[in-house]
Protein backbone atom coordinates (compact mmCIF):
# COMPACT_ATOMS: atom_id res chain seq x y z
CA UNK A 1 0.00 0.00 0.00
CA UNK A 2 1.33 3.39 -1.00
CA UNK A 3 0.78 6.21 1.49
CA UNK A 4 1.82 9.10 -0.77
CA UNK A 5 0.44 8.56 -4.27
CA UNK A 6 1.84 11.86 -5.57
CA UNK A 7 5.40 11.00 -4.50
CA UNK A 8 4.98 7.50 -5.96
CA UNK A 9 3.80 8.98 -9.28
CA UNK A 10 6.68 11.46 -9.42
CA UNK A 11 9.23 8.75 -8.63
CA UNK A 12 7.84 6.38 -11.27
CA UNK A 13 7.89 9.09 -13.96
CA UNK A 14 11.41 10.19 -12.96
CA UNK A 15 12.72 6.60 -13.07
CA UNK A 16 11.04 5.87 -16.41
CA UNK A 17 12.58 9.06 -17.83
CA UNK A 18 16.06 8.02 -16.69
CA UNK A 19 15.90 4.71 -18.58
CA UNK A 20 14.02 6.25 -21.55
CA UNK A 21 10.89 4.12 -21.18
CA UNK A 22 7.97 5.03 -23.41
CA UNK A 23 5.18 4.22 -20.94
CA UNK A 24 4.84 4.35 -17.18
CA UNK A 25 1.97 2.96 -15.11
CA UNK A 26 0.85 4.79 -11.96
CA UNK A 27 -1.95 4.35 -9.45
CA UNK A 28 -5.11 6.22 -10.48
CA UNK A 29 -6.69 8.68 -8.06
CA UNK A 30 -8.32 12.07 -8.46
CA UNK A 31 -5.04 13.78 -7.57
CA UNK A 32 -2.85 11.74 -9.92
CA UNK A 33 -5.41 12.14 -12.73
CA UNK A 34 -5.32 15.93 -12.30
CA UNK A 35 -1.51 16.05 -12.18
CA UNK A 36 -1.24 13.83 -15.27
CA UNK A 37 -3.70 16.00 -17.21
CA UNK A 38 -1.71 19.13 -16.26
CA UNK A 39 1.50 17.46 -17.48
CA UNK A 40 -0.27 16.62 -20.76
CA UNK A 41 -1.68 20.14 -21.17
CA UNK A 42 1.76 21.68 -20.54
CA UNK A 43 3.37 19.36 -23.12
CA UNK A 44 5.49 17.23 -20.79
CA UNK A 45 3.73 13.94 -21.60
CA UNK A 46 2.22 12.69 -24.83
CA UNK A 47 -0.84 10.69 -23.83
CA UNK A 48 -2.77 9.45 -20.78
CA UNK A 49 -4.94 6.33 -20.67
CA UNK A 50 -6.95 4.82 -17.83
CA UNK A 51 -6.63 1.04 -17.69
CA UNK A 52 -7.99 -1.68 -15.40
CA UNK A 53 -5.43 -3.89 -13.66
CA UNK A 54 -5.87 -7.59 -12.93
CA UNK A 55 -6.92 -6.87 -9.35
CA UNK A 56 -9.79 -4.66 -10.54
CA UNK A 57 -8.13 -1.36 -9.62
CA UNK A 58 -7.71 1.37 -12.19
CA UNK A 59 -4.35 2.83 -13.07
CA UNK A 60 -3.00 5.44 -15.45
CA UNK A 61 -0.77 4.57 -18.38
CA UNK A 62 1.25 7.69 -19.15
CA UNK A 63 3.14 7.92 -22.45
CA UNK A 64 6.26 10.04 -21.96
CA UNK A 65 7.53 12.50 -24.55
CA UNK A 66 11.08 12.52 -25.94
CA UNK A 67 12.76 14.72 -28.54
CA UNK A 68 15.31 13.91 -31.23
CA UNK A 69 17.19 10.75 -32.12
CA UNK A 70 18.88 10.63 -28.72
CA UNK A 71 15.43 10.67 -27.07
CA UNK A 72 16.07 13.60 -24.76
CA UNK A 73 13.20 13.75 -22.23
CA UNK A 74 10.89 16.76 -22.15
CA UNK A 75 10.81 16.44 -18.36
CA UNK A 76 14.24 17.51 -17.13
CA UNK A 77 13.35 17.28 -13.44
CA UNK A 78 10.40 16.53 -11.19
CA UNK A 79 10.67 17.62 -7.57
CA UNK A 80 8.21 16.91 -4.77
CA UNK A 81 7.82 19.98 -2.56
CA UNK A 82 5.04 19.43 -0.03
CA UNK A 83 5.49 16.10 1.74
CA UNK A 84 3.31 14.33 4.31
CA UNK A 85 5.79 15.25 7.06
CA UNK A 86 6.27 18.85 5.96
CA UNK A 87 3.44 20.57 4.11
CA UNK A 88 4.28 23.69 2.10
CA UNK A 89 1.57 26.29 1.49
CA UNK A 90 1.63 29.61 -0.35
CA UNK A 91 -0.91 32.33 -0.96
CA UNK A 92 -1.38 33.76 -4.45
CA UNK A 93 1.32 36.41 -3.95
CA UNK A 94 3.88 33.94 -2.56
CA UNK A 95 3.63 31.29 -5.30
CA UNK A 96 7.18 30.81 -6.61
CA UNK A 97 8.22 30.99 -10.25
CA UNK A 98 10.05 27.82 -11.27
CA UNK A 99 13.26 28.65 -13.17
CA UNK A 100 12.02 32.13 -13.94
CA UNK A 101 8.83 30.86 -15.56
CA UNK A 102 10.38 28.08 -17.67
CA UNK A 103 9.09 25.33 -15.37
CA UNK A 104 5.75 24.94 -13.63
CA UNK A 105 4.62 24.44 -10.06
CA UNK A 106 1.60 22.20 -9.56
CA UNK A 107 -0.60 23.51 -6.75
CA UNK A 108 -3.58 22.00 -4.94
CA UNK A 109 -6.06 24.82 -4.35
CA UNK A 110 -9.64 25.13 -3.18
CA UNK A 111 -10.59 25.34 -6.88
CA UNK A 112 -8.76 22.12 -7.77
CA UNK A 113 -5.25 21.21 -8.83
CA UNK A 114 -3.71 23.74 -11.22
CA UNK A 115 -0.47 25.29 -12.42
CA UNK A 116 1.21 28.23 -10.73
CA UNK A 117 0.29 30.58 -13.58
CA UNK A 118 -3.40 29.74 -13.39
CA UNK A 119 -3.40 30.01 -9.57
CA UNK A 120 -1.82 33.48 -9.78
CA UNK A 121 -4.35 34.50 -12.46
CA UNK A 122 -7.29 33.29 -10.35
CA UNK A 123 -5.69 34.76 -7.19
CA UNK A 124 -5.85 31.55 -5.15
CA UNK A 125 -3.16 29.92 -3.04
CA UNK A 126 -2.75 26.40 -1.78
CA UNK A 127 -0.41 23.50 -1.20
CA UNK A 128 2.59 23.35 -3.56
CA UNK A 129 2.70 19.71 -4.66
CA UNK A 130 5.68 19.64 -7.04
CA UNK A 131 7.89 21.48 -9.51
CA UNK A 132 8.36 20.34 -13.12
CA UNK A 133 10.92 21.64 -15.58
Swiss-Prot record:
Self-association and partners: Part of the 30S ribosomal subunit.
GO molecular function, one term: structural constituent of ribosome
Role noted for this protein: One of the primary rRNA binding proteins, it binds directly to 16S rRNA central domain where it helps coordinate assembly of the platform of the 30S subunit.
Keyword Plastid belongs to the record: yes
Example GO BP: translation
A cellular-component GO term for this protein: chloroplast
UniProt entry keywords in alphabetical sequence: Chloroplast, Plastid, Ribonucleoprotein, Ribosomal protein, RNA-binding, rRNA-binding
Family: Belongs to the universal ribosomal protein uS8 family.
Classification via Gene3D superfamilies: 3.30.1370.30, 3.30.1490.10
Compartment(s) of residence: Plastid, Chloroplast
Signal peptide stretch: none
Stated name of the protein: Small ribosomal subunit protein uS8c
